């Protein structure tokens, strides 16, 4: 992808929902991992936290009651996981990004994982309707000794209904634009940076070295303080299990940490249908969760609904 805005520069939006959600998870003696702080403004909420795996892991579901992101909306989500706590966050369904009508929409997510804490950031996919102008930014910063697994997925258009994100009928939709900013860091030191921009007619949409004409892109990342010698066989095991066909293509890579920094394991997916991309993400999580988080891979019940 081509270079775009710096990670800190999520553009201000014109009139629309201005929403904020600030969550903090802590570890309490005799209680385990708990949601210790929740503050919001605008239409962002968190459901009552649950502990389906026992007190050690706090599950939380993030809600956006309007049901979609419209032109001019600006959403900000801040999550902090304190030492010793383990939080798993997901969403109840796809986030729909509607036609922007000349007003860009944006969502910025800032995740902070403190020493000895664990975060699983597992939202469902982002679906861009025809003419959506969307900016999505994710900034994860881990303290030494922290662990995190997360993913994101982008669907360009409602392909099941024959709708394309960058076309209305046979004509390109000039307003269609997607800006992505991802930053993973440890102690403020970058581990992985990705910035890019797509728009209607962009060559990357059809390029065999980019989107290859497929409407879905997904990424899974895992950061853990394991030595490189322990991460390499895990990366190879993951890569060997991944599909490569006309319907879904996936690959894995390992970014070695430098100077004592943790390594980052990346899984990238292109797919024609979200079901195929989702299956690859779930299988990656099932492999990595026991190995890196020392927890059985028990999918949240919400994923089955």
From Swiss-Prot:
Listed GO CC annotations: cytoplasm
Keyword Cytoplasm: yes
Location within or outside the cell: Cytoplasm
Keywords: Chaperone, Cytoplasm, Nickel
Keyword Chaperone: yes
Predominant location: cytoplasm
Entry-linked InterPro entries: UreD
One Gene Ontology term of the molecular function aspect: nickel cation binding
Protein family (similarity comment): Belongs to the UreD family.
Reported function: Required for maturation of urease via the functional incorporation of the urease nickel metallocenter.
Subunit structure: UreD, UreF and UreG form a complex that acts as a GTP-hydrolysis-dependent molecular chaperone, activating the urease apoprotein by helping to assemble the nickel containing metallocenter of UreC. The UreE protein probably delivers the nickel.
Name this protein carries in UniProt: Urease accessory protein UreD
């Amino acid at each position: 992808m081509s270079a775009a805005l710096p990670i800190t520069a999520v553009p201000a939006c014109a009139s629309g929902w201005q929403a904020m959600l600030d969550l903090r998870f802590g570890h309490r003696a005799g209680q385990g991992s708990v949601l210790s702080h929740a503050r919001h403004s605008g239409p962002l909420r968190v459901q009552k936290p649950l502990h389906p795996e026992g007190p050690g892991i706090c599950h939380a579901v993030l809600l956006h009651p309007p049901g979609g992101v419209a032109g001019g909306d600006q959403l900000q989500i801040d999550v902090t996981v304190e030492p010793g706590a383990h939080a798993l966050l997901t969403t109840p369904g796809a986030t729909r990004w509607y036609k922007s009508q000349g007003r860009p929409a944006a969502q910025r997510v800032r995740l902070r994982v403190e020493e000895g804490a664990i975060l699983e950031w597992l939202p469902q996919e982002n679906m861009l309707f025809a003419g959506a102008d969307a900016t999505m930014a994710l900034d994860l910063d881990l303290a030494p000794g922290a662990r995190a697994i997360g993913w994101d997925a982008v669907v360009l258009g409602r392909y099941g209904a024959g709708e394309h994100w960058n076309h209305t009928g046979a004509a390109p939709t000039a307003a269609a634009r997607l800006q992505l900013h991802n930053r993973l860091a440890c102690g403020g030191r970058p581990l992985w940076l990705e910035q890019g921009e797509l728009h209607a007619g962009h060559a990357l949409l059809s390029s065999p070295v980019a989107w290859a004409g497929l409407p879905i892109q997904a990424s899974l990342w895992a950061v853990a303080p394991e030595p490189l010698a322990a991460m390499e066989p895990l990366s190879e095991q993951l890569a060997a299990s991944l599909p490569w066909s006309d319907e879904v293509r996936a690959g894995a890579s390992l970014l070695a940490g430098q100077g004592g920094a943790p390594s980052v394991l990346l899984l990238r997916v292109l797919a024609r249908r979200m079901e195929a991309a989702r299956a690859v993400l779930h299988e990656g999580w099932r492999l990595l969760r026991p190995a890196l988080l020392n927890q059985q891979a028990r999918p949240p019940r919400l994923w089955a609904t």
